[in-house]
A protein has these predicted regions:
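Short, low-complexity intrinsically disordered segments enriched in A/P/G/S/L with frequent Arg
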Residues: 7-12, 16-18, 22-23, 30, ...
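Short amphipathic alpha-helix that is part of the acyltransferase structural core
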Residues: 32-70, 87-88, 92, 185-187, ...
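A generic "binding-loop/recognition-motif" signal
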Residues: 51, 105, 148-149
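Short, P/G- and charge-enriched loop/turn segments at secondary-structure junctions
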Residues: 71-73, 172-178
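Conserved beta-strand in the GNAT
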Residues: 85, 92-101, 105-113
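Conserved acetyl-CoA-binding loop-helix of GNAT-fold acetyltransferases
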Residues: 114, 120-135, 145
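Conserved active-site alpha-helix within GNAT-family acetyltransferase domains
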Residues: 137, 141, 147-175
Length: 206
């Protein structure tokens, strides 16, 4: 009798520990799964109208650090199908970039933004590469960007040129900019002939 009671007493805490360990393991597995989803490499796609507010918020949050020009929500909504967005495993927009037409042969990358937590992971380069492919597929010969940090884009094949080499940009935007005569941005251009003719991730209208 005593031996059986001792056996039951020993078994009870062991069973409890087993159940606890089992629950803890299940919780840990669930947490790891959520972590894997959050860390999953963002997917690129063409923005849709419902993305406009999130893109606007992303640009506003990074306006100072990224030296970004302000954008109105109404403008973004009107031009939403020019944007490519990076979406993480939870469906949040963590990056964006716009392919803006300047002429029949020249397009510009605008509002290139990567959220702070996603920087340093190559997402900006993925966006630029995707915008290059889309520009080539749309029939443009050259792609330009105006940047405060030219080295970043130089590593992706862009070259610094005089602003006057881009009269389309000057006519479209620069003349109305309050910093027109004291612009601190570098004008940069890349020739799209070297970009492979592959299908873009999703259709982009420009």
């Amino acid at each position: 009798m005593i031996e059986s009671q001792v056996s039951r007493a020993k078994a009870r805490p062991y069973a409890g520990r087993g159940n606890y360990v089992g629950r803890a393991t299940d919780n840990l597995s669930a947490d790891l799964q959520v972590g894997r989803v959050a860390r999953r490499a963002p997917q690129l796609r063409t923005a849709v109208r419902s993305d406009a507010r999130k893109i606007h918020e992303l640009i506003q949050r990074n306006q100072q650090v990224g030296h970004l020009l302000p954008r109105e929500l109404s403008e973004l909504t009107m031009r939403i199908d020019r944007f490519v967005v990076g979406v993480d495993g939870r469906g949040s927009i963590v990056a964006c970039g716009e392919l803006a037409p300047l002429s029949a042969s020249l397009a510009e990358i605008r509002s290139l933004v990567v959220s702070e937590k996603r920087r340093g992971q190559g997402l900006g380069r993925l966006l630029v590469d995707e915008l290059k492919v889309r520009a080539r597929a749309s029939g443009y010969d050259d792609l330009c960007v105006f940047a405060h940090q030219p080295a970043y884009f130089a590593h992706m094949g862009f070259s610094i040129v005089p602003h006057t080499w881009l009269p389309e940009k000057i006519m479209a935007d620069c003349r109305s900019c309050p910093l027109f005569r004291r612009c601190e941005q570098f004008a940069m251009v890349t020739d799209l002939d070297a970009v492979p003719e592959v299908q873009p991730t999703a259709q982009l209208h420009v």
